[in-house]
Every structure is written in C-alpha cells, then in structure tokens.
C-alpha cells in the first residue's frame, strides 16, 4: 500500500460528498479534502494512515473517513467562544505547522520549543476547530483570555499513565485518545510530579497528538528505546508532531538528538 493507493481508497469513501474536492500532494505525502462552498478543509498525513492500515486494515480507513466527515461538517457551523469556555484547550503542533488558515486568517499560537508550537482549539465534541483572529474579533475576546482559559482547562484533564519497562528503563504513557494527550505536556504540576517519580534522567516525547511519553532513562539503552518508540508513534500518528524527544530539567524542555547509544543536546 503506497500513498497514492491510500489516497484513492479514502477518496472512494468520501466522493459521495459532491461539494468536496480532493487533491493528492506527492511532495508532502498528504491528501487535502476541501468543501467548495466554505473553502475550508483538512489535510491528512498519509504515511500515518498507511502504518495503521498495516495493523488495523479497513478500520484505519474508516477512522480517517469519520474524522474528515466530522471535521468538514463542523467547519460549516458558526463556532462561538462565548458560552464554550469549558471547551477551549491548547493543542501541540510541529513548528512547521501553518500559522494561518487557508483563507489567510492568522491562527492563535505561541512558541513552545524549537520543535513545537502551542495552538488553541475550541472542542466541538467529535472534532475541534483551531481558534483564529476572526473568532477573537467576533466574540471580542483577547488572546490572553483564550490562553488563560486553555491552560486552566488542560490542567483539569485526567492524567492516567500506563507503565512499561525495558532493560531497567521505565516508560510512562498518557493515551486517553481524547485529542489532548500531547497537550498534557503543558501541565507543569503533572510533569513536576512525574519528575519526583523518576530515578534517572527524565525525557518527554509528543510524537503525535494522541500520546504523551515520559521516560525514566537509567542507561544508554533507554535512549535508543525512546528514539525507536518515538519514531514509531510519529510514523503512525494521524496528527504527527515531532519524532524528537526532550530532556526535562528544572522545569524546562530541551530537544535531544539520539544517535546510537549516545545522546546529543
């Protein structure tokens, strides 16, 4: 299964929507679906879908089709911030993620690390919409108000962790699939609490939006395992973020480059 074949498979499931257009981007290895009426759409990273398809077959395709249908349906609606304060959250994206909508409207975002940015989203139940300047103007909200509410809300999310051990290293995973697993990297009290549990070096990874990995690295093998694990999650994610990991020291995140059994910062 290659990217062109996956594009055709997804398109076949969506072509009944007569107002939608489909475009295959070979350079970006992606698929773009847009609604002609609203000029809005969604971009799908095809390698992640293919990786899931090898494990889940048709279920992986159904998941993407559902995501596209719900997202474009939501874009037809007029979303408001006022009255939806509990549904505003930060989302983590790669540093190369667009800073404006397809219509040229600036998105609300902050720099996070050299590899990541923080965007802000209005949760709409089955999907969400990234908050842009036009939404702020419409509801007469300030950027600071959105950010404050989003940070408060992400701290209120539960942080259940699953644990795995490899060669004396401990790996913790937050994977609730609520769309904001990676966002929990912004919960400073949670990270501080995990730091207290870690016996070795603490590393953190957000390979895609639906997982947060915290590693208790106690030997060189731990760095190799973390690198392989992060790359695997990154390749299989519907919304990939970064294949790099971060050292967590004194409340700060610093990207680490893992080569063989050595690390470089």
Curated annotation (Swiss-Prot):
Highest taxon above the source species: Bacteria
InterPro entries: DUF1444
Family recorded in the similarity comment: Belongs to the UPF0354 family.
Protein name: UPF0354 protein GK2818
Organism annotation: Geobacillus kaustophilus (strain HTA426)
Taxonomic lineage from the root: Bacteria, Bacillati, Bacillota, Bacilli, Bacillales
């Amino acid at each position: 299964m290659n990217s062109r074949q996956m594009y055709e498979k997804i398109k076949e499931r969506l072509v009944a929507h007569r107002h939608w257009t489909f475009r295959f981007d070979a350079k970006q290895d992606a698929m773009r679906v847009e609604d002609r009426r609203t000029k809005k759409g969604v971009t799908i990273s095809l390698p992640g879908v293919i990786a899931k398809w090898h494990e889940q077959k048709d279920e992986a395709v159904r998941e993407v089709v559902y995501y596209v249908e719900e997202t474009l349906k939501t874009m037809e609606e007029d979303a408001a911030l006022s009255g939806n304060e509990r549904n505003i959250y930060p989302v983590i994206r790669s540093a190369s993620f667009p800073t404006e909508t397809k219509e040229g409207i600036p998105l609300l975002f902050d720099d996070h690390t050299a590899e990541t940015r923080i965007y802000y989203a209005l949760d709409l139940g089955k999907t969400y919409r990234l908050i842009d300047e036009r939404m702020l103007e419409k509801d007469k909200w300030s950027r600071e108000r959105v950010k404050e509410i989003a940070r408060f809300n992400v701290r209120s999310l539960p942080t259940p962790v699953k644990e795995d051990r490899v060669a004396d290293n401990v790996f913790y995973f937050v994977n609730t699939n609520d769309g904001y697993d990676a966002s929990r990297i912004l919960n400073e009290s949670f990270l501080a609490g995990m730091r207290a549990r870690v016996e070795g070096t603490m590393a953190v990874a957000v390979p895609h939006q639906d997982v947060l990995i915290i590693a208790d690295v106690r030997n060189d093998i731990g760095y190799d395992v973390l690198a392989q694990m992060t790359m695997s999650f990154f390749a299989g994610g519907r919304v990939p973020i970064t294949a790099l990991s971060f050292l967590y020291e004194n409340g700060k995140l610093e990207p680490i480059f893992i080569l063989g059994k050595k690390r470089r910062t």
